[in-house]
Amino acid sequence: MKLLCGFFLLWLGLVGNLAQSDPSPKEEESYSDWGLRQLRGSFESVNSYVDSFMELLGGKNGVCQYRCRYGKAPMPRPGYKAQEPNGCSSYFLGIKVPGSMDLGIPAMTKCCNQLDVCYDTCGANKYRCDAKFRWCLHSICSDLKRTLGFVSNVEAACDSLADTVFNTVWTLGCRPFMNSQRAACICAEEEKEEL
């Protein structure tokens, strides 16, 4: 009962203060403007979180492709200089993967570098980049087979490793791809908003 009375008194106090304050129309406009701006900002923040979550899951509807907000094609960012490819190390869920995870196979590092360059090219298609990456990895196994002759255990292990690395990139590579595309591209409407 005391709690109910407390809420009632609080409500009366708030209603009384609102009735006493008679803001001028100018103040009211700025208050409603502020409210609309805050509301818009909140929706944009929620949308940004949803987009980030979708990137972690592999993109919207399972499609990982960078698009501008109003359906226009992204354009290369003027003056953008891509980062140096960093081999097979990267960030996973925002945490730097240690260099020790890089297997240090020069041919594999070459494949990873090609993937980095592809991701950093504005307008690239993630699935084409990934397909080239898979082909590069499996070409290592083919070269190994030619060098060592027919050794089924080595060939099977190599193919298995190549498929594992490829599937990891295919499944978890949407976020790095989208981050690279955001850095390499600009959308016409973004340029207007920044002015």
From Swiss-Prot:
It is found in: Secreted. Its cofactor is Ca(2+). Disulfide bonds: none annotated. Binds 1 Ca(2+) ion per subunit. One of its GO terms (molecular function) is phospholipase A2 activity. Keywords: Calcium, Metal-binding, Secreted, Signal. One of its GO terms (biological process) is arachidonate secretion. Ca(2+) binds at S89, Y91, L93, D116. GO terms for cellular component: extracellular region. Its main location: secreted. Residues 1-19 form the signal peptide. It holds the Pfam family PLA2G12. Not known; does not seem to have catalytic activity. Belongs to the phospholipase A2 family. This is Group XIIB secretory phospholipase A2-like protein. It comes from Mus musculus (Mouse). The gene is Pla2g12b.
